[in-house]
Amino acid sequence: MYPDQQKLKLIREAVEEQLTARSLGTRSPEGLFAPIDYTLRLGGKRIRPLLACAAATAFTEAWQRALPVAVALEIFHNFTLLHDDLMDRSPLRRGQETVYRRWGDNTAILSGDAMSIEAYASLAEVADKSLLAELLPRFSQMALEVCVGQQYDMEFETRSKVHVEEYMEMIRLKTSVLLGSSLELGALVGGATVEQARALYTVGIQLGLAFQIQDDLLDVYGDEKTFGKPIGGDIVNAKKTLLLLYTLEQLQGEDLKRLQEILTYTPEERRAYIDEVRALYDKAGTRLYAEAEIERLTAEAYRGVEQLPLREEGRELLLSLFHTLSGRTK
């Protein structure tokens, strides 16, 4: 195992220990806290806490200072997933039954609310209380922007026309700001200047945009075995992804009419037209456009890290995480 991978493993284990130490599974009432414990035990890559601790490592050897922030970010992220599943009526999360399916809508709402509060409780455990005045408004702004992004996402479902620029702004809010804030808050705890931390925030935004575009691509062009779920789900559900919106803007004539016709079908009917829609994406140059955007955004993120005066260990950790995110197949 490479040194950076060993360090990331160490950080991940420390995050898991801190999550366990919060004793969410043993608190009362069980009906409120058991769903929270269940959600956090579903796993995941723990990307956000890893980013926060790696960013701290870029400025100090004492990366453990960032653990309260890292845990806060992970709890908040999982809170958004819990509520997203409820709003989307998703039956499964990471292969397991979602909270609202197992405990009901009301419990999902209340447990999610409690998770968001628990995130703030973890943030408040930062050792340097004077630093908390810097962290709290940034964390709150991030939390609000994630909610704004989710609202836009829901509104897009009922709108007949959504522009690519609007979609990019939505995913910036819904996905990217949490990654950007993970880097920014971790850097601040590590001793970065406000300007250095903000530069890393921008890097996180670029990384988050590339991450979501890659997610859209994998759903249409990924390998089902490595992706972990059926390919073409976004097409079946007529989800307004970058791929669909760009294709609608690029196609003309009969091709455009045909795609618009398929979008009027029911989800079950659209299942038979996944290959045809994929062919229309190819005709519009959508895959090439999306791949070029991922490459551009990822290159900007790497360049942003290379230009900052960081401790070499932290830089290597960040670049290793970026490589994992940008090169993923699932």
Name what the model sees in each region.
Residues R41, E249, T264-P267, E306, ...:
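Alpha-solenoid HEAT/Armadillo repeat architecture
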Residues K257-V305:
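Mobile late-domain/C-terminal helix-loop "cap" segments
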Residues L297, P309-K330:
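Short, amphipathic C-terminal "tail helix"
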Residues L244, A301, L318:
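Hydrophobic, well-ordered secondary-structure elements that form the walls
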Residues K7-A14, S23-L256, E295, H323:
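Mg2+-dependent prenyl diphosphate-binding active-site environment of isoprenoid biosynthetic enzymes
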Residues M142-E145, Q206-L207, Y265-E269, L280-K283, ...:
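A short structural micro-motif
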Residues M1-D4:
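Non-catalytic interface/linker regions that flank or bridge core catalytic/transmembrane domains
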